[in-house]
Amino acid sequence: MKLTVLGAGAWGTALAASWASQHAVTLWGRNARDVDTMRASRVNTHYLPGCPLPSSLALSADFDRALEAAELIVIAVPSSGLRATLAALARRPALPPILWVCKGFEPGTRRLPHQLVAELLPAGAETGVLSGPSFAQEVAHGYPTALTLASADIALAQRLAEALSGNRLRLYAHDDVVGVEIGGALKNVMAIAAGICDGLNFGHNARAALITRGLAEMTRLGVDSGGRFETFMGLSGLGDLILTTTGDLSRNRQVGLRVAKGQPLDRILDELGHVAEGVTTAREVAALAAERGVEMPIARMVCRILFEGLPASEAVDSLLNREIRSEF
């Protein structure tokens, strides 16, 4: 299959490199100079250092040329860039199936990726989302990884899951697009919370409690949004939550660790050099939960720490001193 990955960040590069052993893959990046450097060195030194790119992987900064004869398009740009990418695709005369791998809400609108897809792409477009517990470096190195591929068209999800599995990457088909998207977005907020917890040296008990109650918050908002409960017990929910709240490669967890040490958020993000979707998502989720009356105290406290200057230790005390209630 001929497929094009749009977005040469860490995740787009890792997926393109993994699939290049089985398919004819083109990786598109918007910066021509960076693409030329990658083509010469066969390494994405900025986003994925230490992971050689296979010789079969084509690289391009020409949007139209990269999409020529593509049988599948995978959008791997951040949530903030999804609208522009979809708008560019919508101008094309015909489109193959399209997957997106970004995790989060559109800043300022609180819209999920599938809602932007419905707004911008032609009716009847074949689309889906790929999500789950995955660090780009591990996928690029060929470490075993399992992900969820969800589409409203379960037959499409099954067909693409079969085609894209291999090279120690296993995909499971699902049809709950909303649940998969909500899980992928909210786990980033909980990863920031877990980083704060660890940065304050609160121990393993506190982290376990935070992960468990964080899953409850994810599920509440997900079901309220139309997702299914069982989705949050799967790879794109619990699986992704465990990875990003405990793994040191998690950018969102790193944000939390450094916030807990008192570092300014702007400096953290500048030095990180990569997108940490959970920072933007925290604000959107807190507003969405308040609008709908969905109880999400952890997400709300993360938002207050990041944007309202609430000291992390005070936020923890506030959570622990809430009214005692039934667990379920």
Swiss-Prot record:
GO terms for molecular function: glycerol-3-phosphate dehydrogenase [NAD(P)+] activity; NAD binding. One of its GO terms (biological process) is glycerol-3-phosphate catabolic process. NADPH binds at residues 11, 30, 103, 136, 251, 275, 277. Keywords: Cytoplasm, Lipid biosynthesis, Lipid metabolism, NAD, NADP, Nucleotide-binding, Oxidoreductase, Phospholipid biosynthesis, Phospholipid metabolism. It is found in: Cytoplasm. Belongs to the NAD-dependent glycerol-3-phosphate dehydrogenase family. This is Glycerol-3-phosphate dehydrogenase [NAD(P)+].
